[in-house]
Amino acid sequence: YMKFLHQIASAVEAQIRSLDSERYTMLPCHSASQIYQEAGITELPMLLGFNLYNGWYGGNLGGFEEKLEELHKEFPHKPLLITEYGADVDTRIHSFSPVRFDFSCEFGSVYHEHYLPEILKRDYIVGAMVWNLNDFYSEARRNAMPHVNNKGLVSTDRERKDGYFLYQAYLKESPVLHI
């Protein structure tokens, strides 16, 4: 299987580069990079992306920067992207003591307040994609709000969550005030 996977990935990479030699190629991976290395496909694209949810699906928030350093050591000459990260936030839930998987607005803030500075201070991270801009329907979800993935920075009814304003404050040139 791994040999076949490498053949297919090599063919796709070669085709992309033959059609547009200026276009960057990227492989999105989940956090278990060794699987992709065993298949030999991490060497093929120009960029590597990783879906990282340290402190949400498991582990703790501090595991995020540890994982970033680990990936940089594994792939020192490869620009890296964080292709997915986020925490479910239900705008109806608040907590004075937010914890992982409580779906509170406050844990969502803690999560993004931890991740964003860690991403921005590393020059080998060339991009990051919050999962997701908007909450969206997902039939299989059975969380605080059934059938909805609440990782968006904006709710399904377009209410901007606290995380939305955090990104504005970091990335907008004009000052942002959100109370």
Please describe what each predicted stretch is.
Residues 2-34, 39-179:
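Substrate-binding clefts and catalytic carboxylate motifs of secreted carbohydrate-active enzymes
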